[in-house]
Amino acid sequence: MAKQAIKRAKILAVKNNNKIGVLLINLGTPDEPSVPAVRRYLRQFLSDPKVIDVPSLVRWIIVHLCILPFRPKRSAKLYQKIWMPEGSPLLVYSEMLRERVGETLGDDFCVALGMRYGKPSIETALKKLQEAQCRQLIVLPLFPQYSTSTTASALEGVRAKNSFKEMTVIDRFFEEPHYIDSMTTLIHENLNEFQPDYFLFSYHGLPERHLVKSGCQLAICNRKNNCSPISSSNENCYRAQCFETSRLIAKKLNLTDQQYGVAFQSRLGRAKWIEPYTDKYLIELSKKGIKKLMVVCPSFPVDCLETLEEIGIRAQSQWQRLGGETLKLIPSLNAHPQWVNAIAKMAKKSLQLF
């Protein structure tokens, strides 16, 4: 069925000289690691009501009076530690991914990259696909686990600028076999040179209230424990999706429950965020005598500040202070060949939805 749908789509595209557009969306990055550039980026990012979901006046006060006067200077210094000669790692690797996915999909497709915040914008990416005479649009936010502050916000940005009449969306892929296999292969490649005592899957955190707003009917569960397997009661719960991704990867790696754990990083502000917190989890692991730790960040398909600096530098330093021997950060999928093929397969599979 899938092969027939793909064949029909290809024939239609060639017959009408129209391509199928694929829009890859990532979060975004400052233009440069300077205070003004970081301030512009943070202003746009944090002004999104899906990111800081409080009344507009309260959000304005938080952003303009509590964050922007102080955070840009600190964040700029962090970006400077990871900035590449070619530019922001997130942008460099995302562009590399876009190019290779385009090469893999072939001439019947046109692949564009849009950032929810910063450049290239979603609007710019959509214009490129329109100029390429694409008639159908496949939207793939590069966020494996669905959340309102990432996926829903990105899709809102698309709908605000979209003129395509035929559009399909891949709004999550946390349990997609091609994604899980790509993650497993990446980890296996790094196991050839490092054998850890323990695996830690570290995901981007969210305020707990976001889980309730997502419709999770298990909001009363003790969030310090593992989430239940995905069901109709928690299928939109970001935390549950993270645990499901971890379970699937661990199963592929033949790990027992005692060999891996799940934690959440990058919390901001004083609100209650989903637990356990990555930095505190490291403390608990050190108390258990763990010395060699492998950290995997499945919610970040592309390396960025949160992986390279927060884990690769800060968590590494914390681990050494705690008496750990080695903290090995697994690179993000970036433009790994298997991941490129996985995206191409997901895009082709989505053609059945037109």
Curated annotation (Swiss-Prot):
Keywords: Cytoplasm, Heme biosynthesis, Iron, Lyase, Metal-binding, Porphyrin biosynthesis. It is an enzyme of class 4 (lyase). It is found in: Cytoplasm. It catalyses: heme b + 2 H(+) = protoporphyrin IX + Fe(2+). Fe cation binds at residues 204, 306. Pathway: Porphyrin-containing compound metabolism; protoheme biosynthesis; protoheme from protoporphyrin-IX: step 1/1. GO terms for molecular function: ferrochelatase activity; metal ion binding. Its EC number is 4.98.1.1. It comes from the Bacteria. Belongs to the ferrochelatase family. Catalyzes the ferrous insertion into protoporphyrin IX. This is Ferrochelatase. It comes from Coxiella burnetii (strain CbuG_Q212). The lineage of its organism: Bacteria, Pseudomonadati, Pseudomonadota, Gammaproteobacteria, Legionellales.
